[in-house]
Regions:
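Active-site anion/phosphate-binding pocket segments in diverse small-molecule metabolic enzymes
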Residues: 1-110
């Protein structure tokens, strides 16, 4: 998965945190690297390249909260939110619909 500690996903999550994929939890395996991480998907059927992976949020009946992640890292959820790096686009949702995507790396800031 192309996200790592340079994006604010802490090394403390190595071998401890889960992500959501197809409505199921998948454990982070190995070390969270600078710009990638790996997860164990052997229990999830038909995983495809480019499937959506949820690091924090809801997928089906499963949910991972920032508070859950903060507990794993020994911090508070506010700190995790502040650590999200500028390489991560911000997606604004209103009424369940995406209303804006802000990519801080784009020159037009659009």
């Amino acid at each position: 998965i192309p996200i790592g500690y340079a994006d604010g996903y802490l090394r403390a999550f190595s071998n401890r945190a889960d992500v959501l994929l197809r409505g199921k939890r998948a454990r982070v395996i190995g070390n969270v690297c600078m710009d990638q991480l790996m997860v164990d998907v052997t229990h999830i059927l038909d995983v495809q390249v480019e499937d959506r992976v949820t690091l924090a949020g809801r997928d089906g009946q499963e949910e991972i909260t920032f508070s859950e992640l903060a507990d794993l890292a020994g911090t508070i959820h506010y700190e995790l939110l502040c650590l999200v790096g500028k390489r991560v686009p911000r997606v604004y949702i209103r009424g369940g619909e995406i209303v804006k995507v802000w990519d801080m790396n784009r020159f037009d800031r659009g």
